[in-house]
Curated annotation (Swiss-Prot):
Protein EC: 2.7.7.60, 4.6.1.12
Catalytic activity: 2-C-methyl-D-erythritol 4-phosphate + CTP + H(+) = 4-CDP-2-C-methyl-D-erythritol + diphosphate; 4-CDP-2-C-methyl-D-erythritol 2-phosphate = 2-C-methyl-D-erythritol 2,4-cyclic diphosphate + CMP
Any one GO biological process: terpenoid biosynthetic process
Residues binding 4-CDP-2-C-methyl-D-erythritol 2-phosphate: D241, V242, H243, H267, S268, D289, I290, G291, T365, T366, S367, E368, F372, R375
One Pfam match: IspD
Lineage: Bacteria, Pseudomonadati, Pseudomonadota, Alphaproteobacteria, Hyphomicrobiales
Native species: Bradyrhizobium sp. (strain ORS 278)
Protein name (Swiss-Prot/TrEMBL): Bifunctional enzyme IspD/IspF
Keyword Lyase: yes
């Protein structure tokens, strides 16, 4: 049996996380263009040595969870409990049929865990049976009494910041959690504490100072700034598309079904606005064009809705650790009139792409009755996309 077949991961995502503000659980907030939970889950789902990824979520969050992690590999979510400890036990019980030898337990609120930390966790578990990642303490720590006066100054050299994923042999941590539940002990703050209580020796391995837990609004502000600073490779791409009119009573423009006296002659739905945007994004990535990814010779795309093309292009940006800074599309036509639909089109592009509407522009012009657009034989669109990538992505 290979290491990957023996290793499972639990992603604990059932907390409400209200201290982070924004009116909802912090794991579903967006940071750097992706949800916190998508970043955390992807780290394990994309790791070659992790065979099973078991999320644990609040029952009220199933729909938002599924939307946030669409496309990522994971098991059906286990139902979270009233405490983190109960949620971890639910995740462990859900893994029993998989019979893993090693389990990594990770908090969804730590979205910046790296493949290197995950690999070190697996090595540590196989070597010691129980281990946690730690980071050095750089500040001086004080113990304070009820009066607010300092009572002691711990020796900093002996202190470490505990992180996740905390990693264990599956059978031993499962039994420790079951035993704690039977005895009504519910106040353990992490899995290492349960392991210590159960008599296990818990080793440590090198964590990562960037693997921090997002807790407060200030944490989100700081990490957004850090991510933005890391995306220094700024790229711009342009796109162009045109479709002739044919028979019909509507056209698709920027994701909207627009009534018209004609329709488009096209392999897909003919949405020139979205097609131009897709080409602009792919151009910024130096990743071909819409025809190379969705060839018109492939009947799979016959009549296809163009929103899936735009989603795909956005996913290509995210896959390289980037984010979209701006999208702009200009429609060139006499009719239908774009002005009254401008804000609806911006909103629809934002909905499809996940890009904030403040970063989306829709414009329109005519060709002054010149050329095929002036003769109302079709519609053209030009687009530009500005994206930010990490250097070397």
């Amino acid at each position: 049996m290979t290491t990957s077949q023996r290793t499972a991961a639990i992603l604990v995502a059932a907390g409400r996380g209200l201290r982070a503000g924004a009116g909802g659980p912090k794991q579903y907030r967006t940071i750097g263009g992706r949800t916190v939970i998508h970043r955390a889950l992807a780290a394990f789902a994309e790791h070659p040595e992790v065979a099973v990824v078991q999320p644990v979520v609040n029952p009220d969050d199933i729909d938002v969870f599924n939307a946030a992690v669409a496309g990522l590999r994971h098991e059906a979510p286990a139902r979270g409990g009233a405490t983190r400890q109960a949620s971890v036990l639910a995740g462990l019980e859900a893994l029993v049929p998989h019979k893993p030898e090693i389990v990594l337990i990770h908090d969804a609120a730590r979205p910046f865990v790296t493949p290197a930390v995950i690999s070190r966790a697996i090595i540590a578990a196989n070597k010691t049976g129980a281990a946690i990642p730690v980071a050095p303490v750089t500040d001086t720590i004080k113990e304070v009494g009820a009066s607010g006066d300092i009572t002691a100054t711990p020796e900093r050299a002996k202190l470490r910041i505990a992180q996740t994923p905390q990693t264990f042999r599956f059978d031993t941590i499962l039994e420790a959690h079951r035993r704690a539940a039977r005895e009504g002990l519910t106040e353990f703050t992490d899995d290492a504490a349960i392991a210590e209580w159960a008599g296990l020796t818990v080793a440590t391995f090198e964590g990562d100072v960037a693997n921090m837990k997002l807790t407060t609004p200030e944490d989100f502000v700081r990490e957004e700034a850090r991510l933005a600073a890391s995306l220094g490779d700024i790229r711009t791409g342009t796109g162009y598309d045109v479709h002739a009119f044919g028979e019909g009573d509507h056209v698709w423009l920027c994701g909207l079904r627009v009534p018209h006296t004609k329709g488009f002659l096209a392999h897909s739905d003919g949405d020139v606005g979205l097609h131009a945007l897709v080409d602009a994004i792919l151009g910024a990535l130096a990743d071909g064009d819409i025809g190379s990814h969705f060839p018109p010779s492939d009947m799979k795309w016959k009549g296809a809705s163009s929103d899936q093309f735009l989603k795909y292009a956005i996913e290509r940006v995210a896959a390289r650790g980037g984010r979209v800074a701006n999208l702009e599309v200009t429609m060139i036509c006499e009719r239908p009139k774009i002005g009254p639909l401008r804000d609806q089109m911006r909103a629809r592009i934002a909905e499809i792409s996940g890009v904030d509407i403040s970063r989306i522009a829709v414009k329109a012009t005519t060709s002054e009755r010149l050329g095929f657009t002036g003769r109302e034989e079709g519609i053209a669109a030009t687009a530009s996309a500005t994206i930010r990538l990490p250097w070397g992505a």
